[in-house]
């Protein structure tokens, strides 16, 4: 009886055992192995053969080049500038603008906190302001109703 059960299990166990032995000896399953290559003998340190021609910066680009700190004055900016230089200047100005906006956001939050604390000390709240508005609206509606009733009686 055990021989019938043991047969398929033995075959499966043998297969697993062979697989484990292969893993132990080789260290990997040799699937999709790329050949080991060392660093190439002549790495290309030169720029690629193609390069975009010089770019004539607009007035806005010149301002960005100055704001980014690349040039001190407009006169120092050459007639043609590489696109990479203008792109780097735009990125630097973009980052500076983000920092300025973060600072302004933090400043605005602090101003709102201070104004909220002052409103609390004056006993002002949105609920009280809304209640006053609604009471005024009710009075105006009541007054209009009375005026309409008086006009209807007069006619």
From Swiss-Prot:
Domain of life, per UniProt, equals Eukaryota
Task: Could you list this entry's UniProt keywords, alphabetically sorted.
Answer: Membrane, Transmembrane, Transmembrane helix
Membrane-spanning ranges: 95-114
Q: Which Pfam families match?
A: DUF1075 (PF06388)
Q: How does it sit in the membrane?
A: Single-pass membrane protein
Q: Which residues form a coiled coil?
A: none
Q: Name one GO cellular component term.
A: mitochondrion
Where does the record place it? Membrane
Cross-referenced InterPro entries, in alphabetical order?
DUF1075
What Gene Ontology biological process does one annotation of this record name?
neuron apoptotic process
User: Do you know which PANTHER family this protein is assigned to?
Assistant: GROWTH AND TRANSFORMATION-DEPENDENT PROTEIN, PROTEIN FAM162A
Family classification: Belongs to the UPF0389 family.
Q: What is this protein called?
A: Protein FAM162B
